[in-house]
């Protein structure tokens, strides 16, 4: 097979991040230097993000049967790289006090970003599976990076065992679909699996097993039980990546599969997804109400957010354009709000060897010690709650409009109810940072240069959330560029 210059340009973001991994590995082997490795990784991500300008100029490019580049893939690639960049910025101050090898953290993040980029452009079940594994496997190490601390090691082992089981279900489901369709390409599967044979036992079993695997990766009910424990045990920078990039890449490829293989989006499957959406929204919000640990709260709330996102998948058959816009706007808002929230946790916490702030009470009076981190955390909670003048509100509005447009009143009502429940715990977390501590421990905290840099990144996230919440037009224009024309079965 001959690769043309056009195809090479289309693969630029992927190639740049792969090159970054190679350079980081060689640098670690030559001489360990925390600052150099972090700078190399961040530079690689920035170059990969900039290369999307040239990729977009090409339009639609089929690089191989497995890798398809278009506006849709570019949009989700950008979100994945931004998540990786934020994780690197938050990890640097956290790792400064780490007593073991620091540099491998950045290499693992870069490998996971490769998986996310591959998922954004996946056009085939094989590349989908490779992308999911490339994204998931580095997370085992990232979650357990603070292995001297028992919760981190426990979380890593739990995630590894359950993720391995979920991957087995996913792979077996793909094998069953291949047995019926005779092809693993999304488009070819869409042509083979017509409405007449979608109810065949092999196809139903394959779709069901794939749904189990994907449900685990996306923390959807009833496969979400690992989420709060893993979020709590993982270091704050890893939590930022786990909450954003791992969800964005997988959701992007699932939506492409539903768009290009419409038979996979059957009425039966939509009913199951509807049940999962309602259960995820209710379970995530109700469980988050009782949480005193901030990271567990964000873990449960992520379950409800993926429930809201399922609405976009369910309405895909009725309004494909609106469904894609909804998912893209919601995920962009969720990315910046989650990055900002976990970044604020990383900045507000003590250095690694003194532990992280976990309880909500630990954040009481944060405004008087670290005012920027407190304001950012408060704004991020408001955005996650969907309060007006934040990007989170625009995302929720699109979800509700998509439900109304498709006459899914029961699902729309559940989104409104879930958002109302979520307001309670988000507002509680947003308000507590401004309350003074009773022990008068309200003196400003001493900060390092690296913490100031991480604070700056969280501040940028907050500005984006507010600016796009007030004036969402630039983001809406971007999402319109990132629309896939629906296939007709």
Curated annotation (Swiss-Prot):
Superkingdom field: Bacteria
EC number: 7.1.1.-
UniProt catalytic activity: a quinone + NADH + 5 H(+)(in) = a quinol + NAD(+) + 4 H(+)(out)
Coiled-coil segments on the chain, per record: none
Spans through the membrane: 8-28, 35-55, 75-95, 105-125, 127-147, 159-179, 203-223, 235-255, 271-291, 303-323, 329-349, 374-394, 407-427, 456-476
Topological category with respect to the lipid bilayer: Multi-pass membrane protein
Primary location group: membrane
Pfam families registered for this protein in UniProt: Proton_antipo_M
UniProt entry keywords in alphabetical sequence: Cell inner membrane, Cell membrane, Membrane, NAD, Quinone, Translocase, Transmembrane, Transmembrane helix, Transport, Ubiquinone
Subcellular location(s) of the protein: Cell inner membrane
GO (cellular component) term, any one: plasma membrane
Family: Belongs to the complex I subunit 2 family.
Alphabetized PANTHER family for the sequence: NADH DEHYDROGENASE (PTHR22773)
Cited function: NDH-1 shuttles electrons from NADH, via FMN and iron-sulfur (Fe-S) centers, to quinones in the respiratory chain. The immediate electron acceptor for the enzyme in this species is believed to be ubiquinone. Couples the redox reaction to proton translocation (for every two electrons transferred, four hydrogen ions are translocated across the cytoplasmic membrane), and thus conserves the redox energy in a proton gradient.
Protein name, UniProt field: NADH-quinone oxidoreductase subunit N
Organism from which the protein derives: Proteus mirabilis (strain HI4320)
Upper classification of the organism: Bacteria, Pseudomonadati, Pseudomonadota, Gammaproteobacteria, Enterobacterales
